Every structure is written in structure tokens, then in C-alpha cells.
């Protein structure tokens, strides 16, 4: 049998500022915090924080995901972030407020939602 390789301990990086990407869809919210180069420091989603099904799309689930990602980033020494928001979901504003409430200083908020110049046909309207 092959001998298992020993892995070194995870190195704690000291990254004072970074970028938070909030991808908010109708079904889920994903928060990714990177360093200025774009290397991921921490991430969390509504699904990874324990929500299932339709509850993943709620603002409260987005808040919990943002808090979880921010806590991990602050353990790596992060203090300032720029926020890039993408998507039409319910958790956009709530996730930004949650990042602010954890003690991270937000220096910039930018909406990077892609807008089509009449691209794909949108899904048909729901009839309930």
C-alpha cells in the first residue's frame, strides 16, 4: 500500500484588503472574498450555511452566508473590502449590510450584473 503524504498546516495569510463578490440569483446567494489579485480567501453560500430548497433564496440566508464568509476573511487579517454585486436576487442589499455589520470597512460598492443587448430569450412568465 502506498504511504500517505503528510500535508503541511494551512498557512494563515495576512491580507489587509480584498474584494467581495456577491452573486445573488433567485435560488441562492454566493459570497466570495478574494485578495486584490483574485485568489480566493473565503467563500460561503446560502446552501453551504445550512439552508435547503426555497429558503436559500431568502434575504436571511444571504445574510448568514455573508457573515460566514466575512468571519473567515477576518481570520486572515482582512479589514477593508470592495463589494461587487451581481444578479437579480433578493439577498443583494442584505448581504452588503451583513458584511458591514461584521466590522469590515466597505470602500466601494459596484454593480457588475451583466445586461444583455437583446441576447437570449428570457424564461416564460409563471402562472400560479
UniProtKB/Swiss-Prot annotation:
GO terms for cellular component: ribonucleoprotein complex; ribosome. GO terms for molecular function: rRNA binding; structural constituent of ribosome. The keyword Glycoprotein does not apply. One of its GO terms (biological process) is translation. Gene3D superfamilies: Ribosomal protein S11 (3.30.420.80). Located on the platform of the 30S subunit, it bridges several disparate RNA helices of the 16S rRNA. Forms part of the Shine-Dalgarno cleft in the 70S ribosome. This is Small ribosomal subunit protein uS11. It comes from Synechococcus sp. (strain JA-2-3B'a(2-13)) (Cyanobacteria bacterium Yellowstone B-Prime).
Amino acid at each position: 500500500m502506498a504511504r500517505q503524504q503528510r500535508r503541511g498546516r494551512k498557512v494563515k495569510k495576512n491580507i489587509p484588503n480584498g474584494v467581495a463578490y456577491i452573486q445573488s440569483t433567485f435560488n441562492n446567494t454566493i459570497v466570495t472574498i478574494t485578495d486584490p489579485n483574485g485568489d480566493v480567501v473565503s467563500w460561503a453560500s446560502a446552501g453551504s450555511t445550512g439552508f435547503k430548497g426555497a429558503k436559500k433564496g431568502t434575504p436571511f440566508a444571504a445574510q448568514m452566508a455573508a457573515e460566514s464568509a466575512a468571519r473567515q476573511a477576518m481570520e486572515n487579517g482582512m479589514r477593508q473590502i470592495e463589494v461587487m454585486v451581481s444578479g437579480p436576487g433578493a439577498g443583494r442589499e442584505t448581504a452588503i449590510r451583513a458584511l458591514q455589520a461584521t466590522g469590515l470597512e466597505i470602500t466601494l460598492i459596484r454593480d457588475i450584473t451583466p445586461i444583455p443587448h437583446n441576447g437570449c430569450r428570457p424564461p416564460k412568465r409563471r402562472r400560479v
